[in-house]
């Protein structure tokens, strides 16, 4: 695909990492969250999981408008499985709420408190098999200790939610057979976007809602091909197949596969840094493909 060829040309043959994709401004929080949790930018579920889950959580996403085809798929899944519960977490009552069994209109920016509260609730109600989860994860006790710094009433107050509705959501989540959480720009586009993503991922890891059908923390992209750009290594600090440009072994493997004469040893300028470098006269030539930053990013 075009991203792959452009990235190969720039990094493997021109020898510069000054290339960045729309994934940067769209999905960088999700990328960092996945890398912090799993060691690489990997989405541990796919769209078929929504069709066999017992609980679907939509947070930071007006799916009906932003992902209409996906929303239609959710509607069909709900029609086929009326017992599937849908929770929409959004400060606004959007069209997506028409499919919700429960809408939580939390205060903007309080997502970390909400999901840390869920982790605390799960722990306090004995829903976490700590011995089993501890075999395959690191830091579970630290995460629980951090989550236990506030109680349920404080969470409800911080999030601006009715305590009964909050407890209903928590109860549904810890008692579900399977759970999928879709999160998008309402989570990612934030000064605490990475922490929000990891708070969600932590709940899935702690309750074993990952790595099996109908389960997983799923960051749905906010722009076309924002996932594809990541997979082919189009980000300034990445190489193809989620390889890290600053990892010598990764560099050599990709360089050998490409049979390329050059390979930068460190990440290049990221999108906003590229604009600043252009303004300072440090970048003499720019090739813009498939986007119009003067309109979409008038920095």
Residue ranges and their predicted role:
Residues 1-225, 249-299:
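Cofactor-pocket helix-loop regions in the catalytic cores of large enzyme subunits
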């Amino acid at each position: 695909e075009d991203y792959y060829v452009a990235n190969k040309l720039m990094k493997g043959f021109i020898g510069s990492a000054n290339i960045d994709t729309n994934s940067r401004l769209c999905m960088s929080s999700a990328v960092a969250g996945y890398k912090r949790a799993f060691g690489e930018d990997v989405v541990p579920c796919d769209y078929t999981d929504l069709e066999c889950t017992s609980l679907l959580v939509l947070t930071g996403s007006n799916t009906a408008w932003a992902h209409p085809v996906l929303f239609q798929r959710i509607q069909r899944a709900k029609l086929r499985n009326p017992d599937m519960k849908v929770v929409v977490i959004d400060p606004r009552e959007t069209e997506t709420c028409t499919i919700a069994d429960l809408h939580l209109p939390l205060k903007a920016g309080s997502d970390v408190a909400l999901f840390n509260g869920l982790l605390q609730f799960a722990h306090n109600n004995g829903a976490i098999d700590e011995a089993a989860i501890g075999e395959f994860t690191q830091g579970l006790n630290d995460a629980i200790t951090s989550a236990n710094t506030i109680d349920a009433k404080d969470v409800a107050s911080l999030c601006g939610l009715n305590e009964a509705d909050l407890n209903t959501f928590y109860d549904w989540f810890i008692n579900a057979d399977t759970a999928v959480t879709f999160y998008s720009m309402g989570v990612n586009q934030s000064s605490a976007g990475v922490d929000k993503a990891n708070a969600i991922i932590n709940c899935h890891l702690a309750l074993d809602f990952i790595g099996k059908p109908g389960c997983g923390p799923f960051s749905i992209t906010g722009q076309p091909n924002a996932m594809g750009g990541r997979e082919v290594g189009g980000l300034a600090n990445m190489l193809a197949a989620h390889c890290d440009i600053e990892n010598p072994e990764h560099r050599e493997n990709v360089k050998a596969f490409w049979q390329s004469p050059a390979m930068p040893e460190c990440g290049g300028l990221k999108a906003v840094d590229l604009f600043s470098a252009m303004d300072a006269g440090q970048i003499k030539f720019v090739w813009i493909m498939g986007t119009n930053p003067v309109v979409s990013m008038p920095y």
